Structures are given as structure tokens and as C-alpha cells.
């Protein structure tokens, strides 16, 4: 068949027919066994999920980037899914988590990668990028903006407590006490995931939205709504996948990310004043509650990230950016990757 005919035929094939197969395997990194999902061949892109999620949160991004000629890898992060989950919160500092991603790049035989992170994955991504600028050549942050650490300050958990009026608590404060939140969240994983995914999403009634500040006499599931109908972006089989994994593992691993914040703060004073220097794309939903309480970081992003390629807020989109608006995220992601060449 003539070369031109082959190219024309490829152009007419649907995306699914052109997309390499999604594969799963285990690798040893940084002292743990890590499960990864991977797709495609080419330059490496690593996708880092947040709380309470899994590699599965990138299910719409993996095939799009793979079809465009990238080797795309989405791990179950430390403490999640099929990856090892050490019990000690001290094993979940950002230094440990960044080390995991460095290990992924090495295990796959690469010297460089583009790193993307959503929610808790964003701090992992920008910490890894700041510590290893030789390895991570560009950064994509979803939901959580980068902020330059200032001089002085107090431990994160103390700062959270001081910001709250009497009788109120920040959700991350509620997560600090071992055994409390994990017992509540694990009581019915399917209901938990349904409520969390719905209540932090965009384009839902105001009264249904997640309250990240709540009474000291309340529990975290008191702050979210169990929907009568799922939003269009969320399918029953999606909830089933998450629920099956969390029913097996519990939520302790993910909660340990919050419980290690003070230790991370004490370990990373050397990053005071450090800006994020790599080319960076930031995407968030206009309805994302994180955009509300991280407004300072968002407003100063251009100063904190001198090579910010673009800052995009997607209308009608909430916290679960790449799940709620995969077409927009994939388009922006691919445009950004193209700009790096």
C-alpha cells in the first residue's frame, strides 16, 4: 500500500483504533512496590493523582496523550490502590512522594519527563520539579496552584487552627486524628465516593456543595450531599471502581498525606523563596472549592511561576478537573506539550 494511503487511512481511523493499549504493571521505587497504568510510546509524561483518587482519575487523559505520541504513566500513589501503603504518616512527606516519582522515571529508563499533578498530586509535582529541575522539564498543575514559601511562618496545622473562628474547623484539621476520618469514610466506600465526587464537582446546586469549613461537632460526611442523580461526567461504574479499591485498602494511606504536612514543613525550609521555574500550565475549575481557599496562590501565580504558559479557569467545572472536563484538559495539555518542542 502506498505511504500516502497508509497515512490517509490512519487519519480516518477513530481515536480508539489509533490508541496504544493500556497496560498495568508493578515497579519497585523508593523502597515500595508501585502499581502503574501506562499507555503509548515516546517522551514520558507522568500523571499524579490526588485525594481520594487512583490512577483511574486520569482514564480520559491517558489515551489522548498516548495517541499523540507520548508514553503516559499514571501510578496509584503511595498509600493508594495496588501500591504499597506504609502505616506511618512520616512515610508520606512531600520529599518521600517526590522521591517516588523520581523512582518512576528511573524505573522506566528515562532521564526526563513532563510531570502533571491534580489535587495532592500538584504539590508532589511542583516539589519534584523544584528538587529535580534536571529531570522534570515542564509541569502541569490542576486545581492546586504553586505558592512560594515565605520566611518564618508556623506549622500548617497550627495555621489552620488559627484561621478558624470558635466552634469551626477546617476539613484538614479533622483529618489529623488517626482512626477518626478513616473509620467514617470506610463505613460505606461507595456512598463516600459518590458523595465526595458529587459535592466537589461543578454545576450543582449551591446547597449541595461541599463545606470545607464546618462545626467542631460535625463529621466530614456531614458536609457533603448524596445525590439523587449523578452528574453527566460521573458514571456508576466509575464509583464502583473507586469503591472496590477503597473497600479493600481503606482511606488511611490518603489521609496520611494530610498528617505529614507539619513534617514536610520542617524538612523543606531550604525551599524558602524558591520559585517554580519550569514552563508550567495551570488548569482549574471556576467552581472548584480549592480555588476559593487557595485564592492567594492563584492570584500570585504569575509571580511565583515566571514561565507560566497559561492559567485557565474552566466555567462550570469543579474540583475533579480532568474527570469533569477531559476534552478541555486534553486540548490544553496537548497544546502545552507541543509548545515545548
Pin down the residues of each PLM region.
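Active-site helix-initiating loop/hinge in glycosyltransferases
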Residues: 50, 93, 324-325
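Signature tryptophan residues that serve as conserved aromatic anchors
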Residues: 51, 55-58, 120, 126, ...
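Hydrophobic h-region of N-terminal signal peptides that target proteins for export
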Residues: 10-17
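Catalytic active-site module of serine/aspartate enzymes centered on a nucleophile-bearing elbow/loop
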Residues: 308-341
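Short acidic-hydrophobic surface loop/beta-edge motif
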Residues: 23-29
Amino acid at each position: 500500500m502506498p505511504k500516502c494511503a497508509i497515512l490517509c487511512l490512519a487519519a480516518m481511523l477513530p481515536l480508539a483504533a489509533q490508541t496504544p493499549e493500556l497496560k498495568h504493571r508493578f515497579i519497585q521505587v523508593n523502597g515500595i512496590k508501585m502499581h502503574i497504568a501506562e499507555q503509548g510510546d515516546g517522551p514520558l509524561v507522568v500523571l499524579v493523582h490526588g485525594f481520594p483518587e487512583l490512577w483511574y482519575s486520569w482514564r480520559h487523559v491517558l489515551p489522548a496523550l498516548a495517541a499523540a505520541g507520548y508514553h503516559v504513566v499514571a501510578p496509584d500513589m503511595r498509600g493508594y490502590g495496588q501500591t504499597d501503603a506504609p502505616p506511618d504518616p512520616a512515610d508520606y512527606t512531600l520529599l518521600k512522594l517526590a522521591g517516588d516519582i523520581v523512582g518512576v522515571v528511573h524505573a522506566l529508563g528515562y532521564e526526563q519527563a513532563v510531570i502533571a499533578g491534580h489535587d495532592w498530586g500538584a504539590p508532589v509535582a511542583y516539589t519534584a520539579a523544584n528538587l529535580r529541575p534536571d529531570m522534570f522539564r515542564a509541569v502541569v498543575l490542576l486545581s492546586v496552584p504553586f505558592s512560594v514559601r515565605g520566611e518564618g511562618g508556623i506549622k500548617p496545622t497550627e495555621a489552620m487552627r488559627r484561621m478558624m473562628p470558635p466552634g469551626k474547623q477546617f476539613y484538614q484539621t479533622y483529618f489529623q486524628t488517626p482512626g477518626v476520618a478513616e473509620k467514617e469514610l470506610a463505613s460505606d466506600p461507595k456512598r463516600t465516593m459518590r458523595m465526595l465526587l458529587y459535592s466537589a464537582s461543578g454545576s450543582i446546586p449551591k446547597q449541595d456543595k461541599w463545606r470545607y469549613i464546618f462545626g467542631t461537632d460535625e463529621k466530614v460526611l456531614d458536609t457533603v450531599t448524596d445525590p439523587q442523580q449523578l452528574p453527566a461526567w460521573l458514571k456508576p461504574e466509575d464509583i464502583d471502581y473507586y469503591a472496590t479499591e477503597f473497600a479493600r485498602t481503606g482511606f488511611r494511606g490518603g489521609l496520611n498525606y494530610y498528617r505529614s504536612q507539619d513534617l514536610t514543613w520542617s524538612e523543606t525550609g531550604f525551599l524558602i523563596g524558591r520559585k517554580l521555574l519550569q514552563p508550567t500550565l495551570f488548569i482549574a475549575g471556576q467552581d472548584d472549592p480549592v480555588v476559593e481557599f487557595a485564592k492567594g496562590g492563584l492570584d500570585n501565580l504569575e509571580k511565583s511561576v515566571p514561565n507560566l504558559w497559561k492559567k485557565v479557569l474552566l466555567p462550570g467545572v469543579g474540583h475533579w478537573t480532568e474527570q469533569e472536563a477531559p476534552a478541555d484538559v486534553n486540548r490544553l495539555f496537548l497544546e502545552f506539550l507541543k509548545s515545548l518542542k
